[in-house]
């Protein structure tokens, strides 16, 4: 953040009187209109307070949330395109599609070229990631597959650059979803991937990161780079998190898999307690920012929530298993239907682990 005027300042921040602040705890820079805020979203007292108390004016389930996002961007000049396969056949260096921008990246030698079917566009891209498999089912927010809302633009006569991107994302939250303006916080960052990178603004509500607007303009890495011939807007947001924010359920799994998990809970004879789950998973979310060891996160959340051994064994542990099973089944369905198979080699090994 050595040059915030060059990399992070956008017109919206002047129009809405956002102030740039440094987090009192971690020193990260962020933008807010809340004059009383002293910490970034990761270290605020209201972190994950939307659980049990959603801050949006409307309630949308998983499907409805996408329809709201899609209608907003289409209304604002974007073309909605269908998702690409989760099996990334157009990239030799990737087994699976890990982000929406991957749909449009073409690697030619040492150069990355972007091919957009429309400009600007929005895409509901299913992505597969296996880095945090041990967290799935336990944390309330980790998935092995998820839908990334991709907002992409090339800043030419048809598209746009930073100012309009951030303005659209802000209006999506405040107008389409009814979030109070004071709840929206933008955090400065840099995003690197696929051989290109740029400054980025992550946007949060109640401590939940909903999306990350990346202003891709460099090729290489932070130690050795050059300017790209083509600038790219690469905003990726989690659809699951948008639905979760509006529903305020104990976990993101509840609003994404609700009818399925409810049926499995009934079949298993598990009687859940919403008040208990809201308390427990709020503690889990907060402790994730403090501890890197998942077992420590879980142990501290159990202690903070005051759970008994009986509640852990009869409610929490079985519930974690159901969440994991439903998540893994969804991932396998996407992967197999798009042409991948569980195996002992390559990306198929990840699927084999999940199936087992």
Predicted stretch roles:
Residues 355:
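Aromatic-lined, polymer-binding surfaces characteristic
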Residues 50-352:
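Structured aminoacyl-transfer and RNA-binding surfaces used for tRNA recognition/handling
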Residues 33-47:
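Cysteine-rich micro-motifs
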